[in-house]
């Protein structure tokens, strides 16, 4: 049975939307037709879910859809979430297939994009009650559980964690909202702040930042008000003018007032799920390993913790 949208109007609008970020031969119309013929193909549902998720995220980009189109965006994200949930169910239990695990990860992405709608309407303090509730079966692979927990643990109290890509954002967002860790932190992709003018304006108002021009001028003011952590999924922290003095910590770069937040020692970070993911050829191990490799290069004592979990040999900096 093919997936249904919220209304005929939304279906017409989607048919006129720009091409989604899937393979050129796999347009939304093609994918809908293929799932109508074979509704048991998890890979097809994953492709369609990612296509709709791409449309939903694009609605938050530089060409942000107007507030009148929030129903359109929510319908797209609802459709993405439903397709990705179906892909995960068809592909089997968590950890049994790459297709199923990827569907679960991108399903978290659909909920994260929903949270932006909630923030735009109700402010940054709008929690799960404003755009949830989250489904009980929302999960990510253990290697991303671990990455998210490590990143949240690394940030000072009351901070803003800026993430680089899908893996570190979905991991940190999931642990923050689905698992309830570190409710004092705001988790946000740097790309979303830069590209989504509506979200940025709302966050700047809620965080009491002045009106700033320039690429990252807002960041200097944010650093004066709150601790800011930058995930080491980035190659380096953002370069701004005036320059921000970033301090290197395990897994993150940090700037801003930290108060009495204790620094987390390198030995307190865990990498057991990474070891299992590497042994199982989990594709989500790759972005986690890349972030950890960069972190070990910046903070060599992390190698001792990595050795405890038998992953040091997989990190070039830690090889002896």
Task: Identify what each model region corresponds to.
Residues 2-13:
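Bacterial N-terminal signal peptides
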Residues 162-166, 190:
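Short His-Asn-centered micro-motif
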Residues 13-157, 176-320:
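ER/secretory pathway lumenal C-terminal domains and tails of membrane proteins involved
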Residues 170-172:
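Phosphate- and divalent-cation-binding pockets in alpha/beta enzyme and binding domains
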């Amino acid at each position: 049975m093919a997936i249904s949208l919220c209304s005929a109007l939304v279906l017409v609008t989607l048919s006129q939307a720009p091409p989604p970020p899937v393979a050129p031969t796999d347009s939304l119309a093609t994918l809908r037709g293929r799932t109508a013929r074979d509704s048991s193909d998890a890979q097809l549902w994953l492709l369609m879910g990612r296509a709709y998720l791409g449309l939903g995220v694009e609605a938050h980009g530089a060409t942000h859809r107007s507030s009148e189109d929030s129903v359109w965006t929510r319908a797209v994200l609802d459709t993405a979430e439903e397709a990705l949930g179906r892909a995960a169910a068809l592909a089997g239990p968590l950890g049994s297939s790459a297709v199923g695990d990827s569907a679960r990860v991108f399903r978290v992405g659909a909920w994260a994009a929903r949270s932006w709608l909630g923030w735009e309407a109700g402010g940054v303090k709008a929690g799960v009650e404003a755009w949830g509730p989250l489904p009980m079966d929302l999960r990510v692979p253990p290697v991303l559980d671990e990455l998210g927990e490590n990143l949240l643990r690394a940030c000072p109290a009351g901070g803003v964690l800026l993430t680089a890509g899908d893996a570190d954002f979905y991991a940190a967002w999931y642990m923050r909202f689905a698992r309830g860790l570190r409710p004092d932190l705001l988790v946000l992709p740097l790309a979303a702040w830069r590209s989504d003018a509506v979200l940025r304006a709302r966050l700047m108002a809620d965080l009491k930042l002045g009106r700033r021009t320039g690429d990252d001028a807002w960041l200097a003011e944010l650093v004066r008000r709150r601790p800011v952590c930058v995930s080491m999924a980035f190659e380096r922290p953002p370069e701004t003018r005036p320059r921000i003095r970033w301090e290197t910590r395990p897994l993150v770069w940090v700037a801003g007032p930290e108060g009495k937040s204790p620094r987390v020692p390198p030995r307190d970070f865990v990498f057991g799920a990474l070891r299992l993911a590497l042994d199982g050829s989990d594709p989500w191990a790759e972005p986690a390993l890349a972030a950890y490799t960069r972190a070990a290069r910046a903070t060599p004592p992390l190698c001792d913790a990595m050795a405890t979990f038998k992953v040091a040999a997989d990190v070039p900096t830690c090889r002896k």
